[in-house]
UniProtKB/Swiss-Prot annotation:
1-deoxy-D-xylulose 5-phosphate binds at residues 156, 183-184, 205-206. It comes from Coxiella burnetii (strain Dugway 5J108-111). This is Thiazole synthase. It catalyses: [ThiS sulfur-carrier protein]-C-terminal-Gly-aminoethanethioate + 2-iminoacetate + 1-deoxy-D-xylulose 5-phosphate = [ThiS sulfur-carrier protein]-C-terminal Gly-Gly + 2-[(2R,5Z)-2-carboxy-4-methylthiazol-5(2H)-ylidene]ethyl phosphate + 2 H2O + H(+). Its main location: cytoplasm. GO terms for biological process: thiamine diphosphate biosynthetic process. The gene is thiG.
């Protein structure tokens, strides 16, 4: 059991709702993974009438909605989108995304901090999508963000943890903040590695939605997240350069001599 934004949760896996072959398959994947938080784009919800079925399906799921500002590239766009999302979804949660480069989909750190500062003052619980840059994360925390969502690699790349050192440093430097890896994971083993490092949760979309079987993949990621977290809580042994016998030699009729 853990808490985020004043909400008690069991699952440490969050799922995005885009790119699935069908809305029903998305719903099945969410249920298979036992997910309790799903992200949704406000811009999709403001699209034509044909999307009403998708919205109705989202509302039928026993999940908390985390609207995002996907597609925004400026403070003004992001803040206005966040305000609209609060009215539409009746939540003060907002996943803040402000893209600075269309090729890498890397967030714009300067606009991100400015927008986060405004939204925190307006009472939002801001979930900023950011890089693993320590100084950027510190500025976001200084702005009032209690949650940080650094990427492991560029969105949709599936490359896994590209800068393990920087991510581990974030965990060490921000022990009281909730850290959720957002973007770049492609395999359940990536998620397990993140959780073993002490991160609080993982947000996925492409790795599940674009899998050959999204439902099975969602379930696999859920187990990996749980296993990784248990490994962290259990206290893993440190790696050694030499072997260490697990069977005691007390009472043995012989001794092992060094070569």
């Amino acid at each position: 059991m853990w808490a985020i934004g004043g909400v008690q949760l069991n699952s440490r896996l969050l799922l995005g709702t885009a790119q699935y072959p069908s809305p029903q398959l998305m719903s099945d994947a969410v249920k298979a993974a036992g997910v309790e938080i799903i992200t949704v784009s406000l811009r999709r919800q403001l699209s034509p009438q044909k999307e009403n079925y998708f919205w109705d399906l989202l509302r039928s799921l026993p999940c908390h909605l985390l609207p995002n500002t996907a597609g925004c590239s400026s403070v003004k766009e992001a803040v206005n989108t966040a305000r609209a999302a609060r009215e539409l979804f009746n939540t003060h949660w907002i996943k803040l995304e402000i893209i600075g480069d269309e090729y890498t989909l890397q967030p714009n750190p300067f606009e991100l901090v400015n927008a986060a500062t405004i939204l925190v003052k307006e009472g939002f619980e801001v979930f900023p999508y950011c890089t693993e840059d320590l100084i950027l994360c510190q500025r976001l925390v200084d702005a009032g963000c209690r949650v940080l969502m650094p990427w492991a690699a560029p969105i949709g790349s599936g490359r896994g943890l590209m800068n393990t050192y920087a991510l581990q440093l974030l965990r060490e430097r921000f022990p009281k903040n909730i850290l959720i890896i957002d973007a770049g994971l492609g395999r359940p083993s990536h998620a397990a590695q993140v959780m073993e490092m002490g991160f609080d949760a993982v947000l996925l979309n492409s790795a599940v939605a674009l899998a050959m079987d999204p439902v099975v993949m969602a379930a696999g990621f859920a187990k990996a997240v749980e296993g990784g977290r248990l490994g962290y809580e259990g206290g893993m042994i440190k790696a050694r350069n030499v072997a260490k016998a697990t069977t005691p030699l007390i009472g043995k009729p012989f001794l092992i001599e060094k070569p």
